[in-house]
Amino acid sequence: IRDSSYIGEWVNFGAGTTNSNLKNNYGKVRVQMNDEVFETNRIHLGCFIGDYVKTSIGTKINTGSVYGPGSMIFSKDFPSKNIPILTWYTDSGMSRVGIDKFILNCHRMKKRRGVDFDIVEEQFYRNLFLKVEK
């Protein structure tokens, strides 16, 4: 697949959210995860969006951005290209999402669609939260 974005499950893109899959200089796209930068050797590459990510209206997602599961992005400008898991990103900075608030929102979201947020998935995210808090 030549020009791809990778989107997880239960993602909510606010109206007008956009993503670029080509740099203005036609250079190869680099992707950053945590403190590590990867050379993709690709000219066309969109973004990587984890499960349960939410963006606000009009979010502009840059080429090669990585948004971790459970993150929420609210920004009038281009957000960071690397937003860690379970993180709220606003124009004033980043903060960790409280796990109980995240779990409650997952239950609400899935209930709207007649689906359960089951104990296995809940425990997965609780364990993930503990891992990233260390």
Predicted features along the sequence, with ranges:
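Glycine-rich hexapeptide-repeat left-handed beta-helix
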Residues: I1-E133
